[in-house]
């Protein structure tokens, strides 16, 4: 009886180790857990009413993301180290004329305002999602995440993780150009 009881922890350990090795093998084969497909691709941005980050009392709705041209919706927070890493690249994209709307996610408003003053503000508009409800509606599970939204307010792409030159050039820019051309017609 004691021998059987002693085997139970060993069996549990082996099962956990096997699951871990299986997931590592999937990741090595290119199964990237950050590339989770969004159920919202091809669907309109969820309706929302959010306050401006830097102008409390000023509210915005989903129509700020449907202005006839594509927009990047960047979900960020001061508690997110990867957001800091991607921030300078967002400043560069903004300087190139790429419209970026920021959504500060589950954060302290004053810290976020100070952070933008310190690092520069790439956002044409900064929304404050302090309770995370729009993030929940978008399926956000962490920051940063970036959504490409076409001029009609349809979500066309979602990227979880930092937006960097490789991600922009290989994944988002071709779609940005496609939807920019469609908007110009």
From Swiss-Prot:
GO CC, any one term: outer membrane-bounded periplasmic space
Keyword Cell membrane: yes
Topology with respect to the bilayer: Single-pass membrane protein
Positions in the Cytoplasmic compartment: 1-4
One annotated GO molecular function: disulfide oxidoreductase activity
Positions in the Periplasmic compartment: 26-185
Residues covered by the Thioredoxin domain: 39-177
Keyword Cell membrane among UniProt keywords: yes
InterPro entries: Periplasmic_diS_OxRdtase_DsbE, Redoxin, Thioredoxin-like_sf, Thioredoxin_CS, Thioredoxin_domain, Thioredoxin_ResA/DsbE_sf
Residue ranges crossing the lipid bilayer per the database entry: 5-25
Primary location class: membrane
Keyword terms: Cell inner membrane, Cell membrane, Cytochrome c-type biogenesis, Disulfide bond, Membrane, Redox-active center, Transmembrane, Transmembrane helix
Disulfide links within the chain: 80-83
Localization terms from the record: Cell inner membrane
Gene Ontology BP, a term: cytochrome complex assembly
A matching Pfam family: Redoxin
Family, similarity comment: Belongs to the thioredoxin family. DsbE subfamily.
Function noted in UniProt: Involved in disulfide bond formation. Catalyzes a late, reductive step in the assembly of periplasmic c-type cytochromes, probably the reduction of disulfide bonds of the apocytochrome c to allow covalent linkage with the heme. Possible subunit of a heme lyase. DsbE is maintained in a reduced state by DsbD.
Protein name, entry field: Thiol:disulfide interchange protein DsbE
Source organism of this protein record: Escherichia coli (strain K12)
Gene: dsbE
């Amino acid at each position: 009886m004691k021998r059987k009881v002693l085997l139970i922890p060993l069996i549990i350990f082996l099962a956990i180790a096997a699951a871990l090795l299986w997931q590592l093998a999937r990741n090595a084969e290119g199964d990237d857990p950050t590339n989770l497909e969004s159920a919202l691709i091809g669907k309109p941005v969820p309706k929302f009413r959010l306050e401006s980050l830097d102008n409390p009392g000023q509210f915005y709705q989903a129509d700020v993301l449907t202005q006839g041209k594509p927009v990047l919706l960047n979900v960020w927070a001061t508690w997110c180290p990867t957001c800091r890493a991607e921030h300078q690249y967002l400043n560069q994209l903004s300087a190139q004329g790429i419209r970026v709307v920021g959504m500060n996610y589950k954060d302290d408003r004053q810290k976020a305002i100070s952070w933008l003053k310190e690092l520069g503000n790439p956002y044409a508009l900064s929304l404050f999602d302090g309770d995370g409800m729009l993030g929940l509606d978008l399926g956000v599970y962490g920051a940063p995440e970036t959504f490409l939204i076409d001029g009609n307010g349809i979500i066309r792409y979602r990227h979880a993780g930092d937006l960097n030159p490789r991600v922009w050039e290989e994944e988002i820019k071709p779609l940005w150009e496609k939807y920019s051309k469609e908007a110009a017609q």
